[in-house]
Amino acid sequence: MVVSVPATSANLGPGFDCLGLSLNLRNRFFIEPSSFHAVKLVGEGEGIPKFLTNNIFTKVFYEILKKHGNDGSFKFLLHNKVPITRGMGSSSAMIVGAVASAFAFLGFDFDRENIVNTALIYENHPDNITPAVFGGYNAAFVEKKKVISLKTKIPSFLKAVMVIPNRAISTKQSRHLLPKRYSVQESVFNLSHASLMTMAIVQGKWDLLRCCSKDRMHQYKRMQTYPVLFAIQKIALENNALMSTLSGSGSSFFNMCYEEDAPKLKQVLSKKFPKFRVAVLDFDNDGVLIEKD
């Protein structure tokens, strides 16, 4: 069996913990029944022992199977393309992939709602798991332990230019930087900007994204710990990025632009930040896929 799950970029400026989108950079997971347990990891995280011994994919996969009375062993080949601890949904990709794979082996129907709500048990950030499951641009929240979300597709004439620094940032640690309370003004600012940004994406008003993607809740505090991120954002917006936001909790930076502007934006960012990876990616509208039964 082969299951693939896309990278994601969440928060997107004002959409803290509720907005996210899917990027066409896929982890592929190859699983087959075996008389013994074996895991091989290729790509991102390769050669790092803890990603094998503490692998979230196999943990979730086996837990779901055992819950349904299956105690079999499997061989796993995890082909990771999503950067780890860089704010591009590596954990969500692993968890969603494990859930979808386990359900397929159990003979369950391919039900995205079932996948996303099971994934929520292991990953409580719906802004990451919804685009990983459904693809596209998603708005989501959790009510009574159930994910409520809507998706819209992202057109192919838009591209993502991702700047991926060589610095890991822990989501858990970065949350400790944030205040426990926000003022009414800060809250209204983010609510209004996130709402209008979603409308702009749905209606294709791309020229509004620059002003709509501003944030007063989380980005500044997080970016202060790694000031080069301010420079990335400034240069991206000066070179035709429609919006430029911290990807998840960082350290990666998400930039959206028109297809014709992507090569130049990549060139400028690569020149200014030669030690960082810069990648032009398509958006993904498919989400998790069973590529081979």
From Swiss-Prot:
One GO cellular component, as annotated: cytoplasm
Predominant place of localization: cytoplasm
Gene3D superfamilies: 3.30.230.10, GHMP kinase, C-terminal domain
Involved pathway(s): Amino-acid biosynthesis; L-threonine biosynthesis; L-threonine from L-aspartate: step 4/5
Record flagged with keyword Endoplasmic reticulum: no
Catalytic activity: L-homoserine + ATP = O-phospho-L-homoserine + ADP + H(+)
UniProt keyword annotations, A-Z: Amino-acid biosynthesis, ATP-binding, Cytoplasm, Kinase, Nucleotide-binding, Threonine biosynthesis, Transferase
Subcellular location: Cytoplasm
UniProt enzyme class: transferase
Role noted for this protein: Catalyzes the ATP-dependent phosphorylation of L-homoserine to L-homoserine phosphate.
Protein name: Homoserine kinase
Organism: Helicobacter pylori (strain ATCC 700392 / 26695)
